[in-house]
A protein has these predicted regions:
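Extracellular/periplasmic catalytic domains that process cell-envelope and extracellular macromolecules
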Residues: 8-10, 48-52, 161-169
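Post-HExxH zinc-binding segment in Zn-dependent metallohydrolases
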Residues: 130-182
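Active-site rim elements
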Residues: 18-21, 155-163, 193-199
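Short, conserved helix/loop micro-motifs enriched in His/Cys and acidic residues
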Residues: 101-106, 146-155, 188-190
Length: 235
């Protein structure tokens, strides 16, 4: 590892790492969430993730995305300021690294994603792209089929989940673990859907797919408590 990293925890074979600036409490919280999400994963998916060298990097409050050595190359992207855009990125087979941020892990008031758990979202991408897809070549076809059906049904209109199959999956995982944000009317990012129970009613096909990989737990280590003020229309 790059000498930037000074702290380390082992989440069932997934290293959780950070610089000296990352408080121990944030590293431990990331470890808890990763361990929690992996509990129900099939053994072959876990083995694929561990064997690929997937890891989770925690950014300190005053570190940016490009302070992470593996993401420093994003400084040269003139189309986007990644230090403003992202407080967490998912991993894939080209770069098996998930990142997240201290302020979201510990629910600081200044967290710009205060209503949702970003590590759950970003680690969901890694589970998909590092753990499942490489050993299940037909998985994306399954997702594409589910995605096409919800489009035909007019669901997820004006939400981030409708970006592509990757965000459809990751937003679904957030809903599964009851750590997504909700709004009364779709705002381009979210809608009224933010819990597993609502997901089962609103999108039972995605719910059934997720149930093959995740446990239907009721309590989460996330500090982002479930707030369910709105319910999505079922049709």
């Amino acid at each position: 590892l790059d000498p930037f990293y000074k702290k380390y925890l082992d989440a069932g074979g997934i290293p959780v790492i950070g610089s000296y600036r990352v408080p121990d409490s944030a590293l431990v919280q990331a470890w808890r969430i990763v361990s929690f999400m992996m509990e129900g994963l099939p053994a072959d998916v876990k083995g694929q993730m561990i064997g690929t060298g997937l890891r989770v990097g925690v950014m300190a409050r005053y570190e940016g995305t490009t302070d992470i050595p593996e993401h420093k190359y994003l400084e040269s992207d003139t189309s986007l300021n990644w230090d403003v855009r992202a407080r967490g990125l998912g991993g894939d087979m080209n770069l098996p690294l998930t990142t997240c941020a201290e302020e979201n892990l510990l629910c600081y008031q200044i967290d710009k994603y205060h209503a949702e758990d970003i590590l759950v979202h970003e680690f969901a991408h890694s589970i998909h792209l590092v753990g499942i897809e490489p050993i299940n070549p037909g998985f994306n076809d399954t997702l594409e089929s589910l995605f096409a059906k919800v489009i035909d049904e007019g669901k997820y209109t004006n939400t981030y989940a409708l970006t592509d199959i990757y965000e459809y999956w990751a937003e679904g995982v957030q809903n599964w673990f009851n750590v997504n944000a909700e709004v009364e009317r779709p705002d381009g990012k979210h809608n009224q859907l933010n819990t597993r129970k609502e997901l089962e009613q609103y999108d039972p096909r995605l719910y059934n797919l997720l149930s093959k990989y995740f446990l239907p737990v009721e309590e989460s280590p996330s500090c982002h408590c479930m707030e369910n003020q709105f319910s999505p229309p079922l049709h």
